[in-house]
UniProtKB/Swiss-Prot annotation:
Entry similarity comment: Belongs to the apolipoprotein O/MICOS complex subunit Mic27 family.
InterPro entries, per the entry: MIC26/MIC27, MIC26/MIC27_animal
Name recorded for this polypeptide: MICOS complex subunit MIC26
Gene: APOO
Membrane topology, record value: Single-pass membrane protein
Keyword list, A-Z: Endoplasmic reticulum, Glycoprotein, Golgi apparatus, HDL, LDL, Lipid transport, Membrane, Mitochondrion, Mitochondrion inner membrane, Proteoglycan, Secreted, Signal, Transmembrane, Transmembrane helix, Transport, VLDL
Lineage: Eukaryota, Metazoa, Chordata, Craniata, Vertebrata
GO BP field: cristae formation; inner mitochondrial membrane organization; lipid transport
Expression sites by tissue: Expressed in all tissues examined. Up-regulated in diabetic heart.
Cellular component per GO, a single term: mitochondrial inner membrane
């Protein structure tokens, strides 16, 4: 160990010594030709006479330019549609992932309840033979009844919200029908004199 330290300390201590070195002047030195910085080719500034001349477009460049101008409205429409549908798709994917996680960690008794609700929908589909209106009304109605047996509080909230929406839709429909009635049947030429007036 001592030998290793001795060998490493020796060269290290020599680096601490200082020496002065003097250069000997050349006896036959040529006369100095100093060059200015501006004269170096690296730093030369080009003349201000240059002019930009645009090259003529080739047939290929012209046709590509026309194609780009032709496709521009469609690409902007696609970009706008993509920017509008991207958040909706992300929320749909997130809803799917949340549903998958819920089904993986479902509460006890969830799948039998889901089976009963689905079976009620099938019974509604079987009873709705014939009319298309029955096929639209019976299956969701039976499924709603079965779901309300298992989830009564959620059924009450759903009934309240859907009742308000149905009332709003009915009111809007009434207003539209009233406006149409006034426009088509109560014009000045269509109004008949009542029997009491002459």
């Amino acid at each position: 160990m001592f030998k290793v330290i001795q060998r490493s300390v020796g060269p290290a201590s020599l680096s601490l010594l200082t020496f002065k070195v003097y250069a000997a002047p050349k006896k036959d030195s040529p006369p100095k030709n100093s060059v200015k910085v501006d004269e170096l080719s690296l730093y030369s500034v080009p003349e201000g006479q240059s002019k930009y001349v645009e090259e003529a477009r080739s047939q290929l460049e012209e046709s590509i330019s026309q194609l780009r101008h032709y496709c521009e409205p469609y690409t902007t429409w696609c970009q706008e549609t993509y920017s509008q549908t991207k958040p909706k798709m992300q929320s749909l994917v997130q809803w799917g992932l949340d549903s998958y996680d819920y089904l993986q960690n479902a509460p006890p008794g969830f799948f039998p309840r889901l089976g009963v609700i689905g079976f009620a929908g099938l019974i509604g589909l079987l009873l709705a033979r014939g009319s298309k209106i029955k096929k639209l009304v019976y299956p969701p109605g039976f499924m709603g009844l079965a779901a309300s047996l298992y989830y009564p509080q959620q059924a009450i909230v759903f009934a309240q919200v859907s009742g308000e929406r149905l009332y709003d839709w009915g009111l809007r429909g009434y207003i539209v029908i009233e406006d149409l009635w006034k426009e088509n049947f109560q014009k000045p030429g269509n109004v008949k004199n009542s029997p009491g007036t002459k």
